[in-house]
Every structure is written in C-alpha cells, then in structure tokens.
C-alpha cells in the first residue's frame, strides 16, 4: 500500500468534511472550486474509485439524526451534511450566510432580524420559510423535546424561562411550560425571522450556525414522532445531501439534494453520493479500506501502525 494513496484519500475526505462543516460557502468557494475538483480527481485516480461518489467510515449506528437531540460527533457529521441552519461558519471561522443573509442587529444587541434567501426548499420539494425556523427554535426550548443543547443555544432568547416553566433552584417547574413564549417570530410572509434576546449575546450569530439550530419540518415530525429521522422516506432535510438508503449497522447513503439552495456553492458539491459505513471496529474498517470498499477510515488497528509507518515513497502515517 502506498502512502500517496492514503494521502489522496484523506484529501478527499477532508474536502467532504470542509464542505459540510466549515469551508466552501458561496462567499468563499470561487477561489477554491478549481483546486477542489482537481484534488477530487487525483484522489479518485489514486484509489481507483469514481469521482462521483466515495465511501467513508462513520462509526456506530447514530443514536439520533434529529438536530435538536443529537450530542454525538458521528451524528453531527451526518447532520451538518444533510441540514443547514440560518448561518454557516467558513474555513476562516467567520460567520457567512446559510439559509438566511447575515442578520441585522439592533444597537442594543437585543433584536436580531434574519432575511431568508429566496426559493428555499425542503428535500421533498415543499417550501421552507422563516416559519420553519420559528417552529424549530421553539421546539428546541420545549422541555418535552429534552434537547441537550437547548439552554446553550436558545437560553439567551427572551421568554426562555417561561418556555421551560420557570424552574426553581432544584429544577422543578413553577409554571406551566409554554414554548410559544420564546420571543422568536416569523413574518406573515415567511420571509423574515426576528429573534429578541433577553440580554446581549455577541456570539449569537455563531450559535445560529450550530447544528442544533437547523430547521426540522413540523408536519413530518408531528406525523412520525421520534421515528421521523430513522427512515429515508421520512427524513426530510434541507442541506446539500439527503439520505436515500439506510441499512442499520451497515451503511447510510447520502445523495445530492436536488432541491438544495443555501450557503454552499453548488460547484463545491462534487460528489453525487457519500456512503457512510457503520463500522466501529478498527480491524473491520481497515479491511474495508484494503479491499477498496472504503476510501477513508477514522483509525487503524494498533498492530498495523508499524507497517504503515514503513510505507513506500517516504510517506508517513496519516491518522
């Protein structure tokens, strides 16, 4: 095995990660689109795989792919590829537009107004508006949702304490929780979302790029309960990729979302499919890599490290 192959594969994997996690937004993609395409082709040539799709090791079965409920890295890696929040973080750790333009913020730092991009769609082709974000933010705050990051991402919004029932020092509610008290409101035409904070939060824009702040489709969630995010047919999303196949304990297949519109430059979305192998065992993952089934794995068996560090071409282990 040549280290140049491993390097090329790692490059392809890093590009996929940068597309979904921090790089390649429409505001920064123009200068790197050509180099990305060339790197993808190089990786495909080195590994003998098609540039139109690749396979990576994800890890175990995700505990959940509900943006509001997830707290695991493996789940987040899938969520940030299939969902998109109001804003994104680019490769320079700068906030850039996602589903909305950069917000207008009042002088006192309390009122944040987001203007949605035109023509936004869910993966099922239905319209996505600011009303979907209003629902999703309020769902995050609802105690029944039990979102692990709720207080972190929406706790500074006016009305949050009322939304969660004004808990006492022991965490017991003192009033009936009412998620409608969260001061987040979509305009009647669904074009703008206004968020009123209880106190200034200078980094609220970065919170609006957090995976948990991604929108979920109310009709789908209410019709399917917790199962909405466990099957391709009910997994309605708004990111650059969508789930088209899911075999538990085996694989999840992501395909380009034909209805996607948002912060990513479409020229950066170069892979038609991304197959996520649900493998936790490093030996099984390494075998999948050696057989050509996977082009990127997270780790290798410890006893294989000495042989890999002695690879040809003066390469060094990439892990």
PLM region descriptions:
Residues 259-307:
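Ligand-site clamp/hinge motif
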Residues 50-60, 111-114, 133-136, 193-194, ...:
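Short, well-ordered beta-strand elements
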Residues 306-319:
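Ligand-binding "clamshell"
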Residues 22-33:
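Bacterial lipoprotein signal-peptidase II cleavage site
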